[in-house]
């Protein structure tokens, strides 16, 4: 931290869903945020990462970068490992050497898909595919360096930006008279804007001091992908599209996805005093922002 109390924060993966929300929040902060994506900093290059972190004098590194294509990871696990593990290790080692605190975003995919109890941070980890394995390896790499770190697992992320389930459903329910959506996979959608606000609150307030560890964050409430799709269509006014529930085995996939992805958020709420909105409220807000952007 500088002598004037201003923190320096490095945000990687700044062009992704979460990174773009952090850009919006960081612009109004008295602290100094530096936003990078692969064009500015290749986090798979250990030397470049170390040089950049040392030169920037960062107090906090927030890693929003990830290889998130679950199916493609099955065909090229090495590529996913490079970004989800090796690059994370580079950031963690730089944080360790410089004394920075690393915030790293992980996933519900580190768990298996069985059971019907919300996942606590200390529950056994058993990823079902390559994506989950590489994300778990990333968590383990952070812990192995011994750096000060806050790991936040999230699930079903969506926003106004990039490609995600909400935007796909908005398009398909506008284009098609009917649609099949799986009902046998259950979780809690996470609006990237809400996750960004939570991270921003923790970072800006210095609430992470002495509270490093693993946390879970998603919006409140539970639904299936079918439920989510129905609510998206309702909120968007796409009532003409009939949405049918179907089994996940009707959509062949290279990797088995978790049937139950509900995360227990008790720890992050109690530790940092966070008030987390219900997924339906945030979904409607996101759709409202998309509609407003279309009108401009």
Which residue ranges define each predicted feature?
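Mid/C-terminal beta-alpha module of Rossmann-like enzyme folds, strongest
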Residues: 205-254, 294-295
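NAD(P)H-binding glycine-rich loop region in Rossmannoid oxidoreductase-like domains
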Residues: 46-85, 94-96
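Amphipathic terminal alpha-helices
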Residues: 279-296
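NAD(P)-dependent short-chain dehydrogenase/reductase
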Residues: 140-187, 192-201
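SDR active-site strand-loop-helix element
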Residues: 12, 36, 61-65, 102-107, ...
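Adenosine-cofactor binding site in Rossmann-like domains, unifying the SAM/SAH pocket
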Residues: 29-49
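N-terminal Rossmann NAD(P)H-binding glycine-rich loop of SDR-like oxidoreductase domains
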Residues: 7-25
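Catalytic helix-loop patch of NAD(P)-dependent Rossmann-fold dehydrogenases
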Residues: 82, 87-90, 97, 110-152, ...
């Amino acid at each position: 931290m500088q002598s004037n109390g201003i923190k320096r924060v490095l945000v990687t993966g700044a062009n992704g869903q979460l990174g773009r929300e952090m850009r919006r929040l960081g612009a109004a902060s008295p602290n100094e945020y530096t936003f990078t994506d692969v064009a500015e900093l290749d986090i798979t290059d250990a030397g470049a990462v170390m040089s950049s972190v040392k030169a920037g004098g960062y107090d906090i590194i927030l890693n929003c970068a990830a290889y998130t294509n679950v199916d493609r990871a099955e065909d090229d696990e090495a590529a996913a490992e490079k970004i989800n593990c090796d690059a994370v290790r580079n950031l963690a080692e730089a944080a360790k050497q410089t004394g920075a605190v690393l915030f790293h975003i992980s996933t519900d995919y580190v768990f298996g898909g069985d059971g019907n109890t919300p996942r606590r941070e200390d529950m056994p980890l058993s990823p079902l595919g390559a994506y989950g394995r590489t994300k778990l390896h990333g968590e383990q790499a952070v812990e192995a360096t011994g750096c000060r770190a806050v790991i936040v697992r999230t699930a079903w992320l969506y926003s106004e930006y990039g490609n995600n389930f909400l935007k796909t459903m908005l398009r398909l329910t506008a284009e098609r008279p009917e649609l099949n959506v799986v009902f046998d996979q259950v979780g809690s959608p996470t609006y990237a804007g809400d996750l960004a606000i939570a991270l921003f609150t923790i970072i800006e307030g210095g609430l992470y001091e002495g509270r490093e560890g693993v946390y879970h964050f998603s919006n409140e409430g539970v639904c299936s992908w079918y439920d989510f799709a129905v609510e998206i269509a309702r909120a968007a006014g796409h009532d003409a599209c009939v949405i049918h529930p179907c089994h996940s085995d009707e959509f062949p996939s290279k990797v088995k996805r978790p049937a139950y992805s509900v995360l227990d958020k008790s720890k992050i709420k109690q530790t940092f005093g966070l008030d987390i909105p219900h997924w339906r409220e945030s979904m409607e807000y996101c759709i409202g922002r998309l509609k407003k952007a279309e009108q401009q």
